[in-house]
Structures are given as structure tokens and as C-alpha cells.
Amino acid sequence: MKRIILILVVLIVGIEFSNAQQLPQFTQYMYNTIAVNPAYAGSRDALSIVALNRNQWAGFDGGPETQTLSIHSPLRNEKLGLGLSLINDKAGFENFTYAYVDFSYTIQASADVEVSFGLKGGMTYYKLAEELYNYTEVNQDAYFDERLNRWNANFGAGILVHSDKWYVGLSIPKIINHDMNNSTDYAALETVHYYALGGYVFDLSKSLKLKLSFRVKYTKGAPISNDFTANLLYNEKVWLGGSYRINGKQRAIGAIVDFQVSDQFRVGYTYEIPTGEIRPYTSGSHEILLMYEFKFMKAKQKSPRYF
């Protein structure tokens, strides 16, 4: 009985993530695609640096917290792209850190369409928080005699087809299944995830554009997660929009604002409200995105990048 109670304490705030949802959730996925699809590396024709911080379920003790940092650029050979993806994801007492290198190869399918193929490889570090071991029940339980922290290697692949106005992609960012704890009593699984994403930009007028986008995430043992976003772009400077997520019985509605501060720098903010059972316990989720691009390849850019 003590073992059952202890495991529930460890998992209660992050049970959705512990068994099959290790890859973190974020709303501004259209600008951070490289985190889940290596084919995106170098697609913006610039050295692109993107940092994101997400505080999910603010006010809920042990709620998920996610930070990502991605750097990617085309190489001298325009067909090749190279990138680095770093992710830190914490939920309850569990913490996952990902460090992956991304490589892409692009072919010209037609005058307006490019097809990119990508590979991703790196390491995942799994850790239980040190404060967990401050509990007397933990120190007295032989199950926790051996610290459950460890590194595991993994790799992934993806494809991205895009033009100046639309894109669609498929990816498997982690192909190898890992049981982080080698235990049948407490399974923290790094499982295979499948992603599909896409979007289209409509010209409403000379100064106004509408971008519709989606992302679908699936992994065995968890509900399919569906993200839908709609954003209006005014004068190539300001994005205003909304998002809607369906994840099993959970729902979330969000508002998005994004400013193109300069040709090189942009900042975005998302506020989400869950509509499920957790709603009374949180003030919502906050997500901040910063992007900076060194456009030393500006002459090669065919048009503004909307994703």
C-alpha cells in the first residue's frame, strides 16, 4: 500500500506525461517546428535562433514547465541544413532534458515547391528531482536505493514539403522506445511519437493575411493531441490569433499575439485556458517565444517566411 501511495505522489501532477507523453506540449509550434521535425533545419534561409518558455497550468503545484532552444541554418550548399535542438521539460518530480542535432537535405520539386528530408540524433537525460529524496517514505523504500537518473540515445526522421504559402510535414522525432527505470512497478517510458503538421497563408488584402495551421500528435497509450490555430497578420508586423487544442478529454483555448519588432527580431506570447477538470486549479498557461535571425543569406530569401 505504501508503494502505491508513493508512486501516486510522484506521478499525480504529471501522469499524462509519465507513461506516453514525454515530448512536451507548446502552442507556437509553427515557429519551433525543428523541435519535432528535423527536416525544418535551414528552411528559413537564415541562421535562426528560437527560444521558448512555457509555464503550463500556472498556480498548479508541479505543473509542467518547458524551455526550448533551437539553432539552425542552411549551409553553403543550399540543399543542406544543420541545427541543434535543446529541450528541458519538467512535470512533477520528473525532468527530461533533450539534446539533439538536426540535419536536412532539400530538393526542388518544382518552381515553387521544395521537399526536405531530415534526420535527428542525440541524447535524452531522465532525472527524478532531488527533493523527492527528502521524503522519509522514499528513503525507506528499497525501490529508490538506486537513483533512477540516466542517459539514453535516440534518433528520429522527418519530411517537410513547402512553398511560400503552405507547408505540410510528417515526422517521428524519437524512433527507439526506452523504459527509463527498467521496472515493471514504475514505468517512465520514452515512446515513439508521430507528428503531422501543416498550414496555409491566405492573402486577404495588401496589408492583411490569414494563416491557418494544425498539428497532430500521436503516441501509443495516450489520446491523440490535435492543435488548430488561426492568425491574422497585419502589415507584415503584427500577428493576432487564437488556438484550440483537443487532447482526449482535455481542451484548451488560447490567444496569440506576435510582434515582428525588426527584420531580425520577433517576440510572441500565448495565453491558454484549459476547459477540463483542472480549470479550477489554475489561472491558465503562459508561453513566450523569442526569435532572432542573422540574415546574412538575405539575398537568397525568396519571400517572407510565415512558418
Residue spans of the language-model regions?
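Sec/Tat signal peptide C-region and signal peptidase I cleavage site
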Residues: 15-20
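Subset of outer-membrane beta-barrel
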Residues: 21-307
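Positively charged n-region of N-terminal signal peptides that target proteins for export
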Residues: 1-4, 109-111
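Sec-dependent N-terminal signal peptides
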Residues: 4-14
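Short, basic/polar N-terminal leader/transit segment immediately after the initiator methionine
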Residues: 3-6, 22-24
